[in-house]
Every structure is written in structure tokens, then in C-alpha cells.
Amino acid sequence: MTNRRVQNIKRKRGPVKSKKVVCDGITFASGLEKYMYVALKEAKIKADYEGCTFVLQEGFEFKNESYERQSNGKGKLVNRGCKKILPIKYTPDFISHDFIIETKGRANESFPMRWKMFKKYVNHKMSHVTLYKPQNQKECDEVVKLILIKRKRK
């Protein structure tokens, strides 16, 4: 019997492609969102699914030149300035009067920065709200328990 070394090869993951799921006539962006919805519903906790979009940074007119390659890094430098920059927006998965839930299995590359910006927004404009970010079904169940405990204390 020979000893073989097993190498852990970390494969590069591609973009997140979660499957849309329908429940109660609502189309959810992922199975985890559906799971959270069902868990909230069973606990009789009311929350709107993608009920509100927040503008984290207003759009603006960029008047300078800005020479950049395409986002894929190929091609030659092209002036991508002198145009309107769109606002940065964020739509949480579930929102209620006292909590906001963002279910996130695997985050895309822009999410961590958007989440930090949203936390700052909440800190300044919605200090009464508690944020939850479950990443699996077990954490969704824990979020429901935490919400119920917090509401009983009031």
C-alpha cells in the first residue's frame, strides 16, 4: 500500500446562478429566499418581499474624461467619461417595520461594498431596524427565533 498525497485543488467559481423559485405566486430569486419566506410565514411574522429599494448614492453627471478598458479587461483604452453615472441602489429581500433580512448564499463581487453602504444608511436613517443576513437554512431558522425573542421583549 503506497501513501498518496491528495491535493485540494480549489476551483474558481463562476458567477452565481441561483434558480428562481415560485411559492404562493411570488417568484423568489433563490431557494434560500423561498425558505426564509416560508419560515417567516409559519412563524406569523409579516414582511414584504423586495418591498423597498434604497438609493445608497445618488447618480451624477461625470464631466471629466476617463480612459478605461472594457470591464472584462480587454481591448484598448476608451473615453468612458463625460456621461451620467447611475445611482447605487439596494433592495433587501425582506423588510418589516423593525427588521430587514438579506438572504445571501454566495455573494457576488459588488455585494460586500453595497452591504457596507447599506449599513451606513441604516445607521443614519433607520436606527430602530435590526439587520439579519442568513446564509443557509439553519441561519434562517435562527433569524426567525431572534425576531420572535426581540418582539416578546417589547
What is the meaning of each model-derived region?
Residues M1-K154:
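Electrostatic, structured charged patches in enzyme active sites and in nucleic-acid/phosphate-binding
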